[in-house]
Amino acid sequence: MLEKILIGVAGVLVLFVAVVATRPSAYHVERKLEVAAPADLVFGVLNDLHQFAGVLVLFGSPWEKLDPNMQKTFEGPAAGVGQSYAWSGKEVGKGKMTIEESVPGQKVGMKLEFVEPMESTATCALTLAGTPTGSFVTWSMDGNHNFIGKAFGMFVNMDKMLGTDIEKGLALLKTVAEGR
């Protein structure tokens, strides 16, 4: 009897591993929002991580609320390509974002490096398009899951989880840009 139970458990584990292994590793999450501010103004906030991080701090970032004692450091130029922002905290883990692409008034591309609690990297693009009343901001995030990430994705909707954070970030950006 015990032997049959162990064989059954082993079979379920093998099936689970096989299903996880066949799941796609790449993910893409994207959200858009119209902002009643010109693209150049919005670009200025995004292209300077001091301002971008400041936006999150001043206007109630969910990450700042989660870990108000996290340590933050900035490196590189005053703005644009090469500027980086690193964070470290008990609740938010450890990571770094670096601007890798900067097209004035159009796009800021960043590399995100998550070190703790789970190591991974992702790319983030904030694309701007002018509209008659301001600008349209598209925030996308792309990355690849390792095996554990793919297993986690079977139980958690990554688009919803990451998308909710992106939506909050866009709402904060809108508040700041429209207030300038």
Regions found by a protein language model. Name each.
Residues 4-76:
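Hydrophobic ligand-binding cavity/cleft-lining segments
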Residues 45-55, 129-131, 176-180:
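Structured segments of extracytoplasmic/periplasmic soluble domains
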Residues 62-68, 170-180:
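Short, highly charged C-terminal tails/helix-capping segments
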Residues 39, 43-52, 82, 96, ...:
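Extracytoplasmic/secreted envelope proteins and their assembly/folding machinery
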Residues 34, 44, 87, 91, ...:
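Extracytoplasmic/periplasmic, Sec-exported soluble proteins
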Residues 31, 37-39, 74, 78, ...:
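Solvent-exposed, flexible loop/coil residues
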Residues 2-23, 79-136:
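Hydrophobic-ligand binding "helix-grip"
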Residues 98-101, 111-164, 173-175, 179:
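Beta-strand/loop substructures that line and gate deep hydrophobic ligand-binding cavities in soluble
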